[in-house]
């Protein structure tokens, strides 16, 4: 055994669990050459799993008395469809947007639910599989800012697509320079208002996209940290003979937070889906 081998401190434990499995080592805060391989792999696997679950529900659906699984899926589909009708008034657009919203909800829920797994379970299995005791692995894709901003950026692109599709390229361009402050018959004032309106539109799009992704990331990142702290309580209990009640506190705290976190992961998936519908609905409206 190496002489410098030692059990990790609490800060080392947390820092290690916050490191991603990456294609290359990240050298700066913003580095687009870096790919978080764990986030990509887990999100793709969960996406396929979500598609399989919905396919299975459609495959096994019956017109008679539905099973509990079928009833749950039907309730989910009906909920999403009602929200889509409330926000997207174009029936043709809803044919794509409603299934998209359902996909977003199921996918994000599954990614959020990875936070309910024991903190060390998959990372330790990965270390055993690779033979590297210091291998990194994060299994909650939505606790990765690149994932959530990627999702919100995709929503932004769809907003652009539907703005052009519904209003035409000229109509959307006209809206960018005339809303929210309008225009003027005076060419000078019209130019000034056009620049101000365009800047306001850019700020609005950027703010909505960043807040859309940051809201999901912030909640899931905080939840991940809390689970790490609870796991540290268990580690402290194992190393302490005097802290008799610490293991009990670890179990109680972990159970309470897990139950509460089920609400959080569901609520965050719902909020992200609702904002997606709202933003796409706004893209259909004239300003």
Curated annotation (Swiss-Prot):
GO terms, biological process: proton motive force-driven plasma membrane ATP synthesis
The keyword Transmembrane is annotated on this UniProt entry: yes
SS bond partners: none
SUPFAM superfamilies recorded: F1F0 ATP synthase subunit A (SSF81336)
Membrane topology: Multi-pass membrane protein
GO molecular function annotation: proton-transporting ATP synthase activity, rotational mechanism
Highest taxon, organism lineage: Bacteria
A Pfam cross-reference name: ATP-synt_A
PROSITE patterns xref list: ATPASE_A
Compartments, as annotated in UniProt: Cell inner membrane
UniProt keyword annotation of Cytoplasm present: no
Gene Ontology terms: cellular component: plasma membrane; proton-transporting ATP synthase complex
Keywords: ATP synthesis, Cell inner membrane, Cell membrane, CF(0), Hydrogen ion transport, Ion transport, Membrane, Transmembrane, Transmembrane helix, Transport
InterPro entries on file: ATP_syn_F0_a_bact/chloroplast, ATP_synth_F0_asu, ATP_synth_F0_asu_AS, F0_ATP_A_sf
Transmembrane segments: 37-57, 96-116, 149-169, 187-207, 224-244, 266-286
Quaternary data: F-type ATPases have 2 components, CF(1) - the catalytic core - and CF(0) - the membrane proton channel. CF(1) has five subunits: alpha(3), beta(3), gamma(1), delta(1), epsilon(1). CF(0) has three main subunits: a(1), b(2) and c(9-12). The alpha and beta chains form an alternating ring which encloses part of the gamma chain. CF(1) is attached to CF(0) by a central stalk formed by the gamma and epsilon chains, while a peripheral stalk is formed by the delta and b chains.
Function recorded in the entry: Key component of the proton channel; it plays a direct role in the translocation of protons across the membrane.
NCBIfam families reported for this sequence: ATP_synt_6_or_A, PRK05815.1-1
Family note: Belongs to the ATPase A chain family.
Name the UniProt record assigns to this protein: ATP synthase subunit a
Organism: Acidovorax sp. (strain JS42)
Lineage, broadest ranks: Bacteria, Pseudomonadati, Pseudomonadota, Betaproteobacteria, Burkholderiales
């Amino acid at each position: 055994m190496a002489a410098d081998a030692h059990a990790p401190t609490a800060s080392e434990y947390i820092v290690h669990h916050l490191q991603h499995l990456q294609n290359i080592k990240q050298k700066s805060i913003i580095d687009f050459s870096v790919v978080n391989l764990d986030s990509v792999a887990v999100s793709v696997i969960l996406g396929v799993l979500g598609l399989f679950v919905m396919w299975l529900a459609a495959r096994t659906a019956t017109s008679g008395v539905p099973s509990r699984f079928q009833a749950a899926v039907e309730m989910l589909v009906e909920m999403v469809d009602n929200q889509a009708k409330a926000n997207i008034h174009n029936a043709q657009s809803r044919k794509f947007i409603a299934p998209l919203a359902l996909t977003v909800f199921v996918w994000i829920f599954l990614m959020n639910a990875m936070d309910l797994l024991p903190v060390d379970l998959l990372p330790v299995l990965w270390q055993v599989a690779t033979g590297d005791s210091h291998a990194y692995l994060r299994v909650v894709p939505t606790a990765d800012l690149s994932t959530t901003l990627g999702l919100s950026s995709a929503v932004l692109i769809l907003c652009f697509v539907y703005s052009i599709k519904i209003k035409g390229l000229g109509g959307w361009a006209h809206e960018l320079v005339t809303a929210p402050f309008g225009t003027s018959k005076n060419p000078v004032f019209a130019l000034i208002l056009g620049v101000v309106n365009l800047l306001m539109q850019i700020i609005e799009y950027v703010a909505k996209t960043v807040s859309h992704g940051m809201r999901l990331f912030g909640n899931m990142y905080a939840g991940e940290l809390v689970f790490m702290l609870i796991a540290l309580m268990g580690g402290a209990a194992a190393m302490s003979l005097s802290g008799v009640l610490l293991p009990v506190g670890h179990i109680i705290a972990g159970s309470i937070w897990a139950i509460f976190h089920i609400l959080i992961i569901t609520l965050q998936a719902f909020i992200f889906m609702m904002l997606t519908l709202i933003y796409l609905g706004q893209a259909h409206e004239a300003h």
